[in-house]
């Protein structure tokens, strides 16, 4: 009997080794990983440059308290602010913690303006984490069920709907911020219209609100740029990161700029482990690998190849399928729930995920090569075809 709490419906496999885009189970079977730990291992499993850096750091210094200056933390803050155009960084251990920091920042920003009940606009079908604040911000009733009462201070609107935001702006004087995923992951791999972020930026500027972008899943090169918001040339007031930042070593970050950068003062927020030397060394090395190996360009090249190949191989089903993607973030929406494809893919030694009940989600490592990508497309296309032939008439 396992003594691990029953919080996951785990698949019947135990992985013991990883290299690049491959994993091996405890029986010696090899699997092609098209999920990369849900967008965590962006440079692949156990990249040799990362392994060397971590071994060196473990033998030098693992942790000190944030009551002291931490050299690698300062370096990482410099790097992330330089890449993003934001000004300050707070480090924590996960995406949920990063979003919790953003929510606290927005509330404090509101109180500093004399707003007694600061309220944040959030989106339907969003996912921001499982702490109480981020769970409340998340737009998924199944995830929230059983954890009521949820927190106050949030107003929900449809994603990619500027008119809905304008209606809220006209009727609620306690709004202080908008929090959304630049591209939605858990909600079904959804991408907004080209002018959406510009419209949100304009509304925020008109009302003195903060625009806060959750790039926990879509950031750090996955879409072909360092951050997904850079496709829209819109500057947020705050942005959250995690997942791919540490290549598996837990680290999250909340970045802020402009009027949001100086909101937090000593004592307002903290994290015991956040930004420790080991985690920051992992993040710095990850950024080096992405940059030096041209992985953002590779994400675009291989991502486009996969998107086009899926379209070609699944052409017979084009009337019932929706294929969405940017870089190494790809979703294939089926007309019916398809969660059974995940264990079927596992039998074929390919790791994929189904989100929002009907969307096959692929989040490969940014350094996946064409031959490996072609294998993923071949296996997944065959699975989808098999599934649809038995479900769709």
Swiss-Prot record:
Q: Gene3D superfamilies per the record?
A: Aspartate Aminotransferase, domain 1 (3.90.1150.10), Type I PLP-dependent aspartate aminotransferase-like (Major domain) (3.40.640.10)
UniProt-listed PANTHER family: ACETYLORNITHINE AMINOTRANSFERASE, MITOCHONDRIAL, AMINOTRANSFERASE CLASS III
Miscellaneous field: May also have succinyldiaminopimelate aminotransferase activity, thus carrying out the corresponding step in lysine biosynthesis.
**Enzyme class of the recorded protein, top EC level:** transferase
Q: Which GO terms describe its biological process?
A: L-arginine biosynthetic process
Kindly state which keywords UniProt assigns to this record, in alphabetical order.
Amino-acid biosynthesis, Aminotransferase, Arginine biosynthesis, Cytoplasm, Pyridoxal phosphate, Transferase
The protein's required cofactor(s) are namely:
pyridoxal 5'-phosphate
Organism, by scientific name, is Nitrosomonas europaea (strain ATCC 19718 / CIP 103999 / KCTC 2705 / NBRC 14298)
Spell out the protein name for this chain.
Acetylornithine aminotransferase
The taxonomic lineage of its organism, from the top, reads: Bacteria, Pseudomonadati, Pseudomonadota, Betaproteobacteria, Nitrosomonadales
Q: What detail does the entry give on cofactor binding?
A: Binds 1 pyridoxal phosphate per subunit.
Catalytic activity reported: N(2)-acetyl-L-ornithine + 2-oxoglutarate = N-acetyl-L-glutamate 5-semialdehyde + L-glutamate
In terms of superkingdom, the source organism counts as Bacteria
């Amino acid at each position: 009997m396992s003594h691990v709490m029953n919080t996951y419906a785990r698949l019947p496999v135990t992985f013991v080794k990883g290299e690049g885009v491959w994993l091996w189970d405890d029986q010696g079977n090899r699997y092609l990983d098209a999920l990369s730990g849900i967008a965590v291992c962006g440079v692949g499993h156990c990249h040799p440059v990362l392994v060397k850096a971590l071994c060196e750091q473990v033998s030098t210094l693992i942790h000190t308290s944030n009551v002291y200056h931490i050299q690698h933390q300062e370096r990482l803050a410099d790097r992330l602010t330089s890449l993003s155009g934001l000004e300050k960084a707070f480090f924590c251990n996960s995406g949920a913690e990063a979003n919790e920091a953003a929510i606290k920042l927005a509330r404090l920003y509101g109180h500093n303006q004399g707003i007694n009940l600061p309220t944040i606009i959030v989106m339907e079908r969003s996912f921001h984490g499982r702490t109480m604040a981020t769970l409340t911000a998340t737009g998924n009733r199944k995830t929230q069920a059983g954890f009521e009462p949820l927190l106050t201070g949030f107003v929900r609107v449809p994603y990619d709907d500027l008119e809905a935001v304008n209606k809220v702006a006209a009727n609620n004087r306690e709004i202080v911020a908008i929090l959304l995923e630049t591209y939605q992951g858990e909600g079904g791999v959804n991408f907004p219209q080209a002018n959406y972020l510009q419209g949100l930026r304009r509304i925020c500027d008109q009302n003195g609100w903060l625009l806060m972008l959750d790039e926990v899943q879509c950031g750090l090169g996955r879409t072909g740029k360092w951050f997904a918001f850079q496709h829209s040339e819109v500057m947020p007031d705050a942005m959250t990161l995690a997942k791919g930042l540490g290549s598996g070593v837990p680290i999250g970050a909340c970045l802020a700029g402009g009027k949001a950068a100086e909101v937090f003062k000593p004592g307002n927020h903290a994290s015991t482990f956040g930004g420790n030397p080991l985690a920051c060394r992992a993040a710095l090395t990850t950024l080096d690998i992405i940059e030096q190996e041209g992985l953002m360009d590779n994400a675009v090249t291989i991502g486009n190849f996969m998107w086009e190949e899926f379209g070609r191989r699944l052409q017979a089903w084009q009337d019932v399928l929706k294929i969405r993607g940017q870089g190494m973030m790809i979703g294939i929406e089926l007309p019916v729930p398809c969660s059974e494809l995940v264990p079927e893919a596992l039998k074929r030694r390919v790791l994929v995920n189904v989100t929002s009940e009907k969307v096959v989600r692929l989040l490969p490592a940014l350094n996946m090569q064409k031959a490996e990508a072609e294998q993923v497309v071949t296996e997944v296309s065959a699975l989808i075809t098999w599934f649809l032939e038995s479900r769709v008439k």
